[in-house]
Amino acid sequence: MRLYLSLLFLLTITISGVNGQKTTVLGKITENITNNPIPYVNVIFKDTFTGTMSDLNGNYNLSSVNPTSVIEVSAVGYKKQSFTIKLNQVNNINVLMVEDVVSLGEISIRLGENPAIPLFRKIVAHKKENNPSSFPSWQSRLYSKSEIDIKNVNKSLSKKKLMKQFEFVFRYIDSLEVQGKTFLPVFFTETVSNYFHNATSNTNREEIIANKASGMTTDMITQFTGKMYEGINPYDNYIMISDIGLISPINSLGLQFYNYYLRDSTMLNGRKIYEISFKPKNMQDPTFKGKFWFEDESFALTKLEMQLSTKANVNFLNNLTYSVDYQSKEGRWVPRNESLIADLDIRKDKDSEKIGIMGRKTNVYQDFKFGEEATVTKVPKNAIIVSKDAIKKDDNYWNAARPFELQKRESGIYAMVDSIKTVPLYKTIAEYIYMFYYGYRDLGKIELGPYYSVFSSNKIEGNRFRIGGRTTMKFDQQWRLNSYGAYGNKDKEFKYGGGLEYYFSKKPRLMVALQGSHDYDLLGISSNAFTRDNILTSVLSKNPYTKLNMINRVQATIDKDWIRGFSNQLYVTSSHIESGPLIPFLDQQGNLIPAIRTGEIRLNTRYAPKETIMVDGFQRSTFGIFNPVLNLAVTSGIKGFLGSDYEYLKLDMNFSDKIALNPIGYITYYLQAGKIWGNIPWPLMKIHEGNESYAFDAYAFNLMNYQEFVSDTYVSLFLEHHFQGFFLNKVPLFRRLKWREVVGVRSLVGNYDQTQHAGFVFPQGMTGLRSTPYTEFSAGIENILKIIRVDAVWRYNYNNDQKIKLGVMFSLQLTL
């Protein structure tokens, strides 16, 4: 992954575009008898995906830098016509359309009728029985080939001083231009796997038995190259790409989003096949244009070609092209070949000469088996299994496993990328990209960081300086050590922390750890907030941190994965929490209580059934866009255990999920509930998450102060609806901005038993909740300049004193 990021960074800052000659065809299309203009006539370059349609006045204009010498003109109810054109110049061709009769079995459709609509309804009616995901059980041998390229690369750049070290790379520029662009490959991988599907249990399993990648051979890369990370099934109503639900052309409600046109019919192996083209009704909707073919008996797709609407409200994607051919096996139509091309730009516009990224993937399915033959027992759960020798296959294996030979250029990519890793400039760039992404500077056996905590400031410490580090896989494959030290120029006290981790297994995880620290901390801060010593916390904070306590903490941890999506974490913790300099611990007589000590055992159970975990060394990432997550924690404080002063029991549950509501976006929610038993002081109660910064926090009450409310019984709900531009896409002024609407509500019900406070009094500004729920509402715009979100937040109640009732908050997010 570091190699891939480094190549993109290096080439992006140094490469400029190239120019190509353009061929243009324009004119007017009219009916041959009445001479009336005909709208929505298809005009395409023959044997390409490049085409257009005539407008309401019958005019058309088609241009390309990679055309063919023939255009085809077609429309339902008219005879198809072809015209030869001259390349690299403007061609003016007016077309007279001649009426035709299209025959569909016993039905004759004449001019003015649309035969595509009843046929489309038949396809929808038979979707379930034709959807491969609905077949009871099947398996297939799958070959996948993936490539990532830098597009619009000029070979003359190899002569520039900065690129001299990479001169050999430019020999691999693709000499075959695709859609008028040149490409320099920077990543190439092949995968052979056995793919299993069980519709009854709605589970998939992929066993990756061979993988060959261009210089990158980690498990994380290997798992991403298989089948389970595509998620494209045309039979689904919506094709999920990140948070965006792209509307399938055979969506059950497709007639609301697409216009369909019957174009042709042919015979294939004794079967009659019809061709239907489609285009979006609203180009700003996340829709496609293209065509599909289907069999007239089963109404199953036999082929599909589609391209994302160029005006769709999807970030960075200039083009997304997908095609699939189906084959008939045992009376079922299943995929044979799939092709996916993604054209990405930082700026999505019509300038085809800008530097960008092109991703290509090809899948070939072979050896289908159904029912008992598909060894259904091998699909007990969703999983990706990587064979231990997957990256060790030799050339003889790959020559036999490939369904077709690699191009000479493709074969050379492996050697090219391996050579890049030896270039000094590459190594330097890779180090800085890793530092930016992970927050640590890699020095070999150790990493220094995180860099964003090197400097910060607060009311107690003044200017705080910190240095820390951790070991890497080069130090040890199973042991990981970490430590840090910090010093404030105001309190003039040294703070420190450190720990060690031991991994019996990284996947599934079995890890034990011991961590200790002597440092200030803010009780009750959101887990989603910037860390207290993050420099951004100092910059974005409305008020300097004052509510800090010195905490001496030692914690032992056992972390165990049982099955996919199910894990436990056991914590044994000793804490010594000192009275804060500005938030002292006081009893009811006003006497200072210097500190409180706790010893507790906590067991957390985590269940995320749709979550996928990627492991790369010590790095662990979780994936699952629409992934429900349940956490259940039981904490027992035992008086006398590790010197604890208190006896208590805590039960806390939280559940989060994201629900697709296509085509009107999606909802996210976070539900938390808990109960605490025991006579304990307020620092051990539930301190509800406030936010005193200008940064919007999705898991905090954004107009609640830190440590403003505490409870021993509580229920809270955070809910947001992201409309993904559903309304603004229909407003002419805003649709070009591609802004997206978001609304939210945050509410909290809590109770505090005033007889169970261990003699502590609340500090100034803290209280318990009354019977009325605390509530905040928010409304905002996201996707401003693709990365900015702005929310107006309204505090509905508990507005006594000088509390802020209305605020405007900002956040950054990077999504499609």
Regions found by a protein language model. Give the residues of each.
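Bacterial Sec-dependent N-terminal signal peptides
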Residues: M1-K28, V43, V70, V101-I107, ...
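Short, ordered, surface-exposed loop/turn motifs in non-cytosolic proteins
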Residues: T23-V25, N32-D47, N66
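A short, amphipathic beta-strand motif
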Residues: V25-E31, G58, V95
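Hydrophobic beta-strand segments
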Residues: V41-F45, I71, I109, S140, ...
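A short, solvent-exposed loop/turn motif at the edges and junctions
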Residues: F45-D47, V70-F83
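Short, acidic Ser/Thr/Gly-rich low-complexity loop/linker segments typical of extracellular
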Residues: F49-N59
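Structured extracytoplasmic
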Residues: V101, E106, R110-I273, K279-T287, ...
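Exposed, low-structure sequence patches enriched in small/polar residues
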Residues: I244-L246, K378-L816
